């Protein structure tokens, strides 16, 4: 087999594996979230369908796929129809440049668990994952429903504001490492526990986590939907499989965000002591992913004015100060 044919086959297999694994993980994440929230609320959670309620996932999938797909008569039908697809596609495309695990050898060839190892991977991931919100915005506007439009507008204001917070936090990381490559950022932290960037950039870590909650529409910083204020927000008019596509895209973005935090701040897939790198990657990413559930269970939903004041009066000034301190440290 020629090198090009092997490369093409390898890339195709990687794409199929990523889509299959992360679509499945999105379903498992819903089960995990329900169990975690039940524990916080002193309930049991799903436990009737299958052992430990695991088959509840299949039941939910059947229910979702067999629901009637309704398109409102006064909506912008084409945009309304494709918006959920944009959400899922952008979420999966952003995973293409994220290195998942350490490289390994298969059939005498070195395999890198990444679809495209590009030297501007960080820009690519942030850019494509940011496009996911266009699906939310377009879906809300195309629905021609006042709650959907309000949810889309609130989310647009938040995402524009908090993208600045996340970008300023990441610039500090790039200044230290000197590269936009996620592989280079991972390798920068390969000298042991205290080489992790969370110790050199603790403020950037906090700022990026907060921006990530806005990016993934998670409580307590989610402005696109609120049962007490705007019902389901942008998704009020969606049902069936189209709603499921939004759902899969959101959870895939959450998983990608957890992996990205691990790569940027927590040592990536570098091994620790006798623990292999791939185990460390899974454990650390799972821990970050758990924070989504913990925050939803522990904190109340913030009002839009509180979210925006926190951004412009606290977070952006802190991000700028952190950037200036990092620049001085690099120069000196």
UniProtKB/Swiss-Prot annotation:
Name of this protein: NADH-quinone oxidoreductase subunit H
Highest taxon listed in the record's lineage: Bacteria
Cystine residue pairs: none
Gene Ontology molecular-function annotations: NADH dehydrogenase activity; oxidoreductase activity, acting on NAD(P)H, quinone or similar compound as acceptor; quinone binding
Membrane topology category: Multi-pass membrane protein
Source species of the chain: Campylobacter jejuni subsp. doylei (strain ATCC BAA-1458 / RM4099 / 269.97)
Protein family (similarity comment): Belongs to the complex I subunit 1 family.
Enzyme Commission code: 7.1.1.-
Subunit composition and interactions: NDH-1 is composed of 14 different subunits. Subunits NuoA, H, J, K, L, M, N constitute the membrane sector of the complex.
Transmembrane regions listed in the UniProt entry: 4-24, 44-64, 78-98, 120-140, 165-185, 194-214, 255-275, 279-299, 312-332
């Amino acid at each position: 087999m020629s090198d090009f044919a092997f490369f093409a086959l390898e890339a195709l297999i990687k794409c199929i594996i990523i889509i299959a694994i992360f679509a499945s993980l999105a379903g498992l994440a819903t089960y995990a979230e329900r169990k975690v929230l039940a524990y916080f609320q002193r309930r049991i959670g799903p436990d009737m369908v299958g052992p430990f309620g695991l088959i509840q996932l299949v039941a939910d999938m059947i229910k979702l796929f067999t629901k009637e797909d309704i398109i409102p008569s006064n909506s912008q039908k084409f945009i309304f129809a494709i918006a959920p697809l944009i959400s899922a596609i952008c979420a999966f495309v952003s995973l293409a440049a994220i290195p998942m695990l350490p490289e390994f050898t298969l059939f005498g060839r070195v395999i890198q668990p990444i679809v495209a190892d590009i030297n501007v991977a960080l820009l690519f991931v942030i850019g494509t994952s940011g496009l996911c919100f266009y699906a939310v915005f377009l879906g809300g506007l195309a629905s021609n429903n006042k709650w959907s439009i309000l949810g889309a507008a609130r989310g647009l204001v938040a995402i524009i504001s908090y993208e600045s917070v996340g970008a300023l936090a990441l610039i500090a990381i790039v200044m230290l490492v000197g590269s936009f490559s996620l592989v280079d950022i991972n390798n920068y932290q390969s000298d042991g526990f205290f080489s992790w960037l969370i110790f050199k950039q603790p403020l950037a870590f906090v700022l990026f986590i907060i921006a990530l909650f806005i990016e993934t529409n998670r409580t307590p910083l989610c402005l696109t939907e609120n049962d007490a204020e705007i019902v389901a927000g942008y998704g009020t008019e969606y049902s069936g499989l189209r709603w499921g596509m939004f759902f899969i895209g959101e959870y895939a973005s959450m998983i990608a965000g957890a992996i990205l935090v691990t790569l940027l701040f927590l040592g990536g897939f570098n091994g620790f002591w006798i623990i292999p790198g791939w185990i460390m990657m899974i454990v650390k990413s799972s821990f970050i992913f758990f924070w989504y559930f913990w925050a939803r269970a522990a904190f109340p939903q913030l009002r839009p004015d509180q979210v925006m004041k926190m951004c412009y009066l606290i977070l952006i000034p802190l991000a700028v100060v952190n950037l200036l301190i990092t620049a001085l440290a690099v120069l000196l």
